[in-house]
Amino acid sequence: MAFLRNLKAVKGSSRVEVYGMPQWRNFEAIEPEYLTALNVHISSAAYLDYSMPSVKAFQQAFYEATGTLPDEDGFNGYDITLFTGKMLRQFGLSFPGRLSSQVFRGLRGDLRFAPVYTTTVPDDRSNQYDYLENMFVHILKFDKYGFVPVGN
């Protein structure tokens, strides 16, 4: 990317942090040297740590059942199904009303739902939200060989 190349050239010894788009994670044309030198960060709804025992166990079970390794949709489906099952067991059919009070840590990330109001009339929130949205997001930084969660 010309932008990163030019920024690296003009930054000199100054410390710079660049916040990019989640799509940058899959750009093979971006040199790792630029990502490191410019302290590139991106946001992501998901991050899989393949060294975690729970991720390895799911991969093994999925492979034994299907003969192939799970893709991103497989991990997402597992997390959503497990979360929904736990909510049903704990709250029964009334679980949708409890979504915003529960946090679930899945293989790909957390589920932290919050109500979203789209009404244009202020104070017209008579407990009727328009929908729930997962507010959790990973902030990833480039560290030598790939993107990792900030703090690791």
Go through each PLM region and give its residues.
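Extracytosolic ligand-binding ectodomains
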Residues: 1-152
